[in-house]
């Protein structure tokens, strides 16, 4: 009995010491304004999180009005230090910032079913090397296969009917982007496998929704809870199904190699081979890396494609100039890298649609602003909120905005969709810029070339409304538009007139 009492007293003492340390230790972020802290009578941050989810834009605006340095914000994940955009250039290449840990923390990469978010298992260095040294240099070679697949998908999704008929823009965009990405990532057979395309589209949505449910539980209970949630079981099933599909691809590749000539072997030029080359014999998980590619590529690109389609329906005066540019450029350059670069108005339209969608050690910035070790940070990137926006009429859509800026010598290099600058960080900034943005830009331009030359587009009675969820701003998933087949001026499958 004495031993039990001793353990009880000892445990209580340790718990008391821990409580004192936690509750009475100085908050290293206390110097920064707290925008949505607990209100009187609120014991936990539950209501603060709800206010963030539903009112993030107004909270950001409030924060900017109170300080021009940094402020604290309760998000649905954690307390975040939000920095003013003036610090972007100072932090763009800071070696002490880690952009792989937040996704793993936010999406529970250590739990089964969430392995594609685990940076140890997916090995982001292999992924980044593949994108940088293999995918991006091959942009000039992906034009024709992407064009062929776009032609195939649009015929299935939009049909060849010359009568007006309705489509769901978001669903169509997801199918198109998933198939195009899979064509380059895994080849022509897998990109038409409904099971794989279903995983590419559905896994990310399911993972995001399940992560929200898990955040309602104490973190120390997640190792147990996730075994019983139906959505977690579904994620584990999808990971296993993905492993089966990729395993078949790898087995087929190995069989082909055994009896292949060098010419036949060279035909397998896609991310399966590229990832193996970049791993250089080191550890990586092919299935998880392919799922990771799907997570980062499918929904973000499909969301931008959807938004561009909505914006063009709301600004139909852009359709004919875009079609004229497409005909001129593709007739002259085919689907070469030069063609992608010279689609300048299309590039400007994409960048404008993207514009309107809007730490391991202590870091002290040049003005004395301190970022304590372990702090999660974000930066304001919504120029309709920032009073120091560098864009004229920044809250209005102007499809010609960036093509006009090309005439300004000091800004000409900043105007392309793939350019990353301090005032347009749709693809990130500095060392943290998205390495796959060149492929994404190519994919979207080719998809839009086919869509605009082959179909008339118009809005119905319902105007699309972007959906907000915390910091997230996504294109309308419900609004439909009307389309009908038109006769394209040139053949687009191979880029020849």
Swiss-Prot record:
Its cofactor is heme. It is a single-pass membrane protein. Pathway: Secondary metabolite biosynthesis. PROSITE patterns: CYTOCHROME_P450 (PS00086). SUPFAM superfamilies: Cytochrome P450. GO terms for molecular function: heme binding; iron ion binding; monooxygenase activity; oxidoreductase activity, acting on paired donors, with incorporation or reduction of molecular oxygen. Heme binds at residue 434. It holds the Pfam family p450. Its EC number is 1.-.-.-. It is found in: Membrane. One of its GO terms (biological process) is mycotoxin biosynthetic process. The keyword Metal-binding applies. Cytochrome P450 monooxygenase; part of the gene cluster that mediates the biosynthesis of the indole diterpenes penitrems. The geranylgeranyl diphosphate (GGPP) synthase penG catalyzes the first step in penitrem biosynthesis via conversion of farnesyl pyrophosphate and isopentyl pyrophosphate into geranylgeranyl pyrophosphate (GGPP). Condensation of indole-3-glycerol phosphate with GGPP by the prenyl transferase penC then forms 3-geranylgeranylindole (3-GGI). This is Cytochrome P450 monooxygenase PC-05. It comes from Penicillium crustosum.
């Amino acid at each position: 009995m004495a031993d039990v009492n001793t353990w009880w007293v000892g445990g209580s003492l340790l718990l008391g010491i821990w409580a004192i340390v936690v509750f009475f230790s100085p908050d290293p972020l206390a110097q920064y304004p707290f925008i949505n802290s607990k209100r009187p009578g609120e014991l936990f941050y539950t209501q603060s999180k709800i206010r963030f989810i539903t009112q993030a834009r107004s909270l950001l605006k409030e924060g900017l009005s109170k300080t021009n340095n940094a402020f604290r914000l309760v998000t649905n994940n954690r307390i975040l230090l939000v920095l003013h955009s003036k610090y972007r250039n100072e932090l763009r290449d800071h070696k002490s910032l880690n952009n792989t840990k937040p996704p793993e923390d936010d999406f529970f990469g250590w739990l089964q079913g969430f392995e594609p978010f685990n940076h140890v298992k997916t090995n982001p260095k292999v992924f980044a090397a593949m994108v940088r040294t293999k995918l991006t240099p091959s942009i000039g070679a992906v034009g024709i296969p992407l064009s062929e697949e776009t032609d195939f998908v649009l015929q299935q999704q939009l049909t060849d009917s010359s009568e007006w008929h309705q489509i769901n823009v978001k669903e169509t965009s997801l199918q198109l982007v998933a198939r195009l990405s899979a064509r380059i990532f895994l080849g022509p057979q897998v990109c038409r496998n409904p099971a794989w395309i279903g995983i590419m589209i559905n896994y990310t949505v399911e993972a995001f929704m399940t992560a929200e449910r898990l955040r309602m539980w104490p973190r120390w209970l997640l190792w147990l809870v996730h075994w019983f949630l139906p959505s977690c079981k579904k994620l584990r099933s999808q990971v296993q199904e993905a492993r089966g599909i990729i395993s078949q691809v790898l087995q087929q590749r190995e069989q082909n190699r055994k009896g292949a000539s060098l010419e036949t072997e060279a035909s397998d030029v896609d991310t399966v081979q590229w990832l193996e080359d970049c791993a250089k014999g080191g550890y990586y998980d092919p299935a998880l890396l392919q799922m990771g590619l799907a997570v980062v590529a499918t929904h973000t690109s499909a969301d931008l494609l959807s938004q561009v389609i909505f914006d063009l329906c709301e600004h139909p005066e852009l359709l004919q100039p875009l079609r004229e540019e497409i005909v001129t450029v593709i007739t002259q350059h085919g689907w070469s890298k030069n063609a992608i670069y010279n689609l300048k108005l299309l590039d400007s339209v994409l960048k404008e649609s993207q514009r309107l969608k809007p730490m391991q050690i202590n870091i002290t910035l040049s003005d004395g602003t301190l970022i304590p070790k372990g702090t999660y940070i974000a930066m304001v990137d919504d120029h309709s909120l920032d009073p120091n926006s560098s864009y004229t009429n920044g809250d209005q859509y102007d499809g010609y905005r960036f093509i006009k800026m090309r005439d300004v010598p000091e800004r000409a290099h900043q105007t392309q969709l793939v350019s990353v600058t301090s005032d347009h960080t749709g693809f990130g900034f500095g060392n943290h810029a998205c390495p796959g943005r060149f492929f994404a830009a190519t994919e979207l331009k080719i998809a839009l070339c086919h869509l605009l030359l082959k179909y008339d587009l118009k809005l119905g009675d319902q105007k699309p409304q972007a959906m907000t969820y915390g910091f997230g701003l996504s294109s309308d998933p419900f609004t439909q538009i009307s389309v009908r087949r038109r006769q394209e001026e040139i053949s687009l499958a191979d880029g020849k007139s």
